[in-house]
């Protein structure tokens, strides 16, 4: 059954209230799901690997053409996508690629969103098939995804490479959350290989040796403490997680690659 814009808005508000989450963030997630379901329903399904956040990795160089076709797929959900801008990703050191700035439109609901599509990422050992549970529907869609070890390896590499210059607190939060839920599922040998492969891809092969010293400096840095407090104020889901908590988790992850 197709939901009306008013029904979607109402359900989003209820979920936000129950989970103490920002309704606008949930609306972006819902609209991202509408795009991902179009990916799952398209002929390009096997060419895309979901990485997390708003980043999608495209294989075999089909990013621009396929994305333009995917956005026009009609699933009968009342959602359309308007591409406002297509640009090269220039502000991230981790990956080159294309950024799509678009509006997801459902009746009078207009939700701005960005989707980053990169190529050439290293996944160790390989992508996995993932059943993505939808936010408002009691069903899942099947997509290819990064495996846990590669996700953690990339986040750890980012934290170490940026060091005291890091302004992206989300990686610390993600490491804390992923370890809290999935630590027992981590294959340490795969994690080590994924970290080495990521460092090689990003030309930071010496990070493993430098990791303990970098971690100690990051742990004691007053500016990063302040940035984390700002992140907590902006995102209620992080309010109960201290800087010491995220550093403990990050150091734990770092110890697993030694």
What are these regions (language model features)?
Residues 1-48, 58-258:
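Structured mid-to-C-terminal alpha-helical surface segments
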Residues 55:
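Catalytic metal-binding/acid-base residues of hydrolase active sites
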């Amino acid at each position: 059954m197709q939901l009306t814009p008013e029904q979607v808005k109402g359900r989003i508000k209820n979920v936000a209230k129950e989970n103490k989450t920002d309704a606008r963030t949930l609306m972006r997630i819902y609209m991202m799901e509408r795009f991902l379901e179009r990916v799952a329903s398209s002929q390009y399904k096997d060419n895309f690997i979901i990485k997390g956040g708003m980043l999608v990795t495209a294989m075999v160089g089909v990013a621009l053409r396929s994305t333009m076709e995917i956005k026009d797929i009609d699933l009968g959900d009342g959602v359309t996508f308007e591409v406002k801008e297509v640009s090269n990703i220039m502000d991230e050191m981790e990956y080159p690629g294309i950024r799509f700035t678009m509006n997801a439109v459902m009746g009078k609901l207009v939700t701005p969103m960005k989707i980053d599509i990169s190529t050439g990422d290293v996944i160790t050992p390989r992508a996995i098939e993932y059943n993505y549970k939808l936010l408002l529907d009691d069903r899942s869609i099947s997509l290819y995804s990064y495996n846990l070890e590669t996700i953690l390896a990339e986040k750890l590499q980012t934290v170490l490479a940026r060091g005291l210059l890091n302004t992206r607190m989300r990686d610390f939060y993600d490491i804390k959350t992923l370890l809290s839920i999935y630590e027992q599922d981590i294959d340490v040998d795969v994690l080590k290989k994924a970290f080495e492969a990521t460092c090689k891809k990003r030309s930071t092969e010496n990070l493993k040796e430098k990791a303990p010293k970098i971690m100690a400096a990051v742990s004691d840095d007053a500016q990063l403490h302040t940035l984390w407090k700002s992140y907590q104020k902006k995102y209620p889901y992080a309010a109960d997680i201290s800087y010491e908590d995220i550093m403990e988790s990050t150091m734990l992850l770092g110890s697993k690659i030694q």
